[in-house]
Each structure stands twice: as C-alpha cells, then as structure tokens.
C-alpha cells in the first residue's frame, strides 16, 4: 500500500514520466493492396509498435484486401474508415490519425481531403498510381471495357478485370463501376491530387523506402504539394515497398509523440 501511495504521489508531482497524451490518440491504419491487417502482415509490426507506445489502434480489413478484391468503391471505403474512427472514439480517443501502407496510404490521403478534424495523416510506401504508365498502360483495355459497361447501364455487373500491384498482375472480380472508380487516371486515387487537396492545418508524415519506386519520384511528385505545416515530414528509410511499415515504426511513433 505504501509503495502504491508513493507511486501515485510521484505521478502527481510529475516525477514519473508517462506518455500522458498517447492514449488520447487513436490511429486508423490501412493495409496495402491484396493485403491483410494481422500481426504477420506487412503493417503488423507498425500497428503493434503503436499499441506498445500507448495509442489506440484500429486496422480494419478494407475493400482492396486479399479476400475482398474491390467489393466497394472509394466512397464505400471511406465509410468503413468512418466506422473505425467511431470505434476509436468509443474507446476514448480524442485525436484521430489516419494512415496506411501502399493503397492504404493512398486512401488515407483521400480521406484527409473529405473529412474534417484529423490530427494527422501518416503514409508509408504510398502506392497505387493509376495516372502513371506502370498501372495506366496495363489496365487500359479493361478500364475502357469497364467504362463502356458503365455507359451502357451495366455498371453494377460484376466481371473479371486486371489489377497491378508493384508490377505483379492478377485478375480481380469487381463491378464495372467500382473498377472504374479505383483505376480512373483522372479520379480520386491520384495521389498528387489528394495531397494538394488536404485540409489546411493537418500535418503529414510521408515515409518511403529507398528501394521503393516511389522514392525515385521524390518530394516533388506529391509531398511538396501538401498545405504547409511545421510538423510535415518526409522520410526516406532503408528497404523497399513491402517492408516500409516495419522500418517506419519508430519514425511514426516519434512523430506522433511530437504532435
């Protein structure tokens, strides 16, 4: 009992250092394309590091997961993030960070353009670039076919369409309307467009692996278009696309601590 009293007194006096604000921050973290959110997934080490630091974390399975393969459009994905935010607030989170890896990072940016009140956005190895040749040229025929289906009133008809993930290709089953939404080279998933449209006053952390193709595009591709903020940070770490969340874990924890 005496030891408990001493500890409480020390806490009250500020002698014992604890991350008092950590539990106030809730983080929605979104997995990459064809991925999942479990402990052994590419984002697992990062979400675990966030929890260890005292943050409340929600890492939902999203419409682009291995098992779902674009079963909802972009607005539907944002609604699922809304649900995750609600869960975090129900657990006591007062400030909300939205982040992700690869396509998850892309959608975190889209969310930041359409929702108010975020405390920050974290993107690690941002990916899915439908405006660039690596995706645009590969999906061109299927995109044109899907767009014609939409024009012909068959937008809700499901079919097989090609998808690309870091050079790997596979067919996905999706409705024509949803496929067009995700693959549109002039649409919402164009990263530079999202960054330029982020809400002022929301800081952005961008972390990319040196071996990732995105790193070669540099800050000018998208990051430099973000609204100015003293906490904006662009970090290049070791590694490539898939292992960026693991390598970024301490960078993200430190950045959140500084907010």
Region roles according to the model:
Residues 16-22:
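Sec/Tat signal peptide C-region and signal peptidase I cleavage site
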Residues 25-50, 62-63:
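Short, surface-exposed "cap/lid" segments of acyl-processing enzymes
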Residues 71-91:
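Alpha/beta-hydrolase active-site loop
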Residues 87, 95-145:
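Primarily recognizes the serine-hydrolase "nucleophile elbow" in alpha/beta-hydrolase
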Residues 124-194:
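Accessory cap/linker subdomain of secreted extracellular hydrolases
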Residues 198-200, 206-208:
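Short beta-strand/loop motif that positions the catalytic acidic residue
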Residues 213-219, 244:
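Conserved alpha/beta-hydrolase "acid-adjacent" motif
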Residues 235-259:
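Catalytic active-site module of serine/aspartate enzymes centered on a nucleophile-bearing elbow/loop
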